[in-house]
């Protein structure tokens, strides 16, 4: 029924079959549930483009014909496809009743490799599509809104976090050349700022995780204590994206 409304592609509710396995699989699960409920569902209500995630999506034959096949071969081809649709004005919808159950990684090594590929893929999309997306942001109506939404989605926000850490590191290093009383004050202020930033980041992610788990409670196959317990580890899961994002900047990544 959703596809018959004229969409060029339709994405789904992405659930997980192994939420309860450990904090890693739960971290993935919470992220994808949040994506479905609080990103794609509102986008559909507002009439803007959704973005596909993973392999659980449907594509119209006319899209394949218009593109002469499937020309999306970056490391995150799902995001590449979503961005391209926004730029071309093709519509992606969301079907809440179409559910897929992914099996998420359960070891940090598996998770590192997968998210390293995703991070590299996002950088590739940024390189190829930032300018077209920016131009698209100035179009009227749904087209401009969809381009702006995708631009914010793929913007390298983690790099801003890394730059903040680097900047504070430079401040700490520079203060070592200052008199002791001044260096002590600078160190105190800088460390306090960084500690506050980390705490606010943790609390914000904790809130996102809690709201997601509570809203999707009946869809999560896990004991209540596991659902709530893994909310506490969700921010830690997200923190691990920081070293992954750094590695993706310099490391060669392939399928």
For each predicted feature, which ranges?
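Catalytic donor-sugar/metal-binding loop of nucleotide-sugar-dependent glycosyltransferases
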Residues: 47, 73, 82-100
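Structural detector for helix-capping/boundary residues
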Residues: 61-62, 79, 98
């Amino acid at each position: 029924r959703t596809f018959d409304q004229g969409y060029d592609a339709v994405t789904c509710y992405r659930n997980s079959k192994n939420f309860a396995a450990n904090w890693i699989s739960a971290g993935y699960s919470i992220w994808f549930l949040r994506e479905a409920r609080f990103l794609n569902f509102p986008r559909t209500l507002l009439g803007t483009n959704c973005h596909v995630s993973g392999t659980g999506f449907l594509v119209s034959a006319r899209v394949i014909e218009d593109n002469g096949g499937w020309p999306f071969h970056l490391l995150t081809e799902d995001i590449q496809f979503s961005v391209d649709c926004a730029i071309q004005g093709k519509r992606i919808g969301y079907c809440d009743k179409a559910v897929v159950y992914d099996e998420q990684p359960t070891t940090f090594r598996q998770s590192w490799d997968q998210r390293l590929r995703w991070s590299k893929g996002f950088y590739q999309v940024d390189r190829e599509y930032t300018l077209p997306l920016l131009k698209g942001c100035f179009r009227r109506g749904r087209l401009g809104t969809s381009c702006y939404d995708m631009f914010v989605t793929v913007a390298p926000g983690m790099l801003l976090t890394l730059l903040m850490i680097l900047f504070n590191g430079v401040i700490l290093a520079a203060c070592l050349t200052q008199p002791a009383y001044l260096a002590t004050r600078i160190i105190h202020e800088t460390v306090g700022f960084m500690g506050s930033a980390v705490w606010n980041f943790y609390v914000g992610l904790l809130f996102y995780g809690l709201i997601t788990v509570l809203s999707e409670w009946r869809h999560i196959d896990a004991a209540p204590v596991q659902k709530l317990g893994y909310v506490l580890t969700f921010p830690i899961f997200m923190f691990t994206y920081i070293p992954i994002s750094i590695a993706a900047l310099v490391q060669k990544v392939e399928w």
